[in-house]
Amino acid sequence: MRKHAFGVVLVLVAFLMVTGCSGGKPNTYTDPSSTISVRSNQEFIIALEANATTGFAWEAVYDESILQLVSQNYVPDEHEEGMVGVGGTDHLRFKALKTGKTEIELTYKQPWVEGEGEYDQHLTFKVEIK
């Protein structure tokens, strides 16, 4: 009986170690005043309010030797069927490639407008990779 209980405990500990070490869901950040702190090879998401129906989108400028943009997708807010012009959230998923400090400069703009548009918005997120 003791051997059986020990085996069960051993399997449970092994399971917890494996699941505890699997990265899980990446952290999501929305506040540019807080520094994003991640480990090398870790992914994170910056989620920002947006409204794709206006033609505006978030454009990211970042150091490609330190960060990789894995994906960018827009998710509209829940709304009644048939509604148009509904806002949503733009999710920019990054992967930290190596240790260091960097910034992600984000501009909310209409891509076809040359130079600075009247309604453009700018945000800067600081990133520290350990």
Q: What is each PLM-predicted segment?
A:
Residues 94-104:
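Glycine-centered tight-turn and secondary-structure capping sites
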Residues 1-8:
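Bacterial N-terminal signal peptides that target proteins for export
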Residues 84-91:
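Aromatic sugar-binding surface patches on proteins
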Residues 17-20:
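C-terminal motif of bacterial Sec signal peptides marking the signal peptidase cleavage site
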Residues 22-46:
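N-terminal edge beta-strand
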Residues 127-129:
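Interdomain boundary/hinge segments at the C-termini of tandem beta-sandwich modules
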